[in-house]
């Protein structure tokens, strides 16, 4: 009986500890998201932030969608994807978010197109152009696939 009470107390203590820590992380995460939006989308406001596991899905007032990876302990929040396809204001992903190598490739071979979506992960990058073409790059910016 005594063991059960101790185990229950430890479990409740752990649950309270993790709940309080996640609230702090959420407040810090929201500050990071707001700073990102102020930097790259200065005329927009965050209208929704949805936590999906460790990720945060953010919708801006112009319907731009941004996904952040919240699974990076002790590091700054990183964006995984920026999607301006449904934006009422931005017709392309802000240039400051696009690596130079990718921007150069698009300007050389797809000069009439804009990058409307960009995503990154440990394997590389993926972009979608305004004409619907999707291009995948590896981590060294070599083309892996064009769809």
Where are these regions (language model features)?
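Bacterial Sec-dependent N-terminal signal peptides
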Residues: 1-9, 13-40
């Amino acid at each position: 009986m005594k063991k059960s009470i101790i185990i229950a107390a430890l479990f409740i203590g752990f649950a309270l500890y993790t709940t309080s820590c996640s609230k702090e992380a959420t407040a810090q995460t929201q500050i990071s998201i707001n700073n990102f939006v102020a930097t790259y989308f200065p005329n927009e406001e965050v209208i929704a932030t949805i936590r999906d596991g460790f990720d945060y899905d953010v919708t801006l007032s112009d319907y731009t969608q941004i996904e952040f990876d919240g699974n990076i302990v002790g590091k700054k929040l990183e964006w995984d994807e920026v999607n301006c396809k449904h934006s009422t204001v931005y017709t392309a992903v802000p240039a400051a978010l696009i690596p130079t190598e990718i921007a150069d490739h698009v300007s050389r071979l797809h000069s009439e197109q804009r990058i409307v979506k960009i995503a990154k992960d440990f394997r590389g990058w993926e972009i979608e152009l305004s004409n619907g073409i999707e291009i995948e790059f590896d981590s060294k910016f070599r083309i892996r696939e064009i769809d």
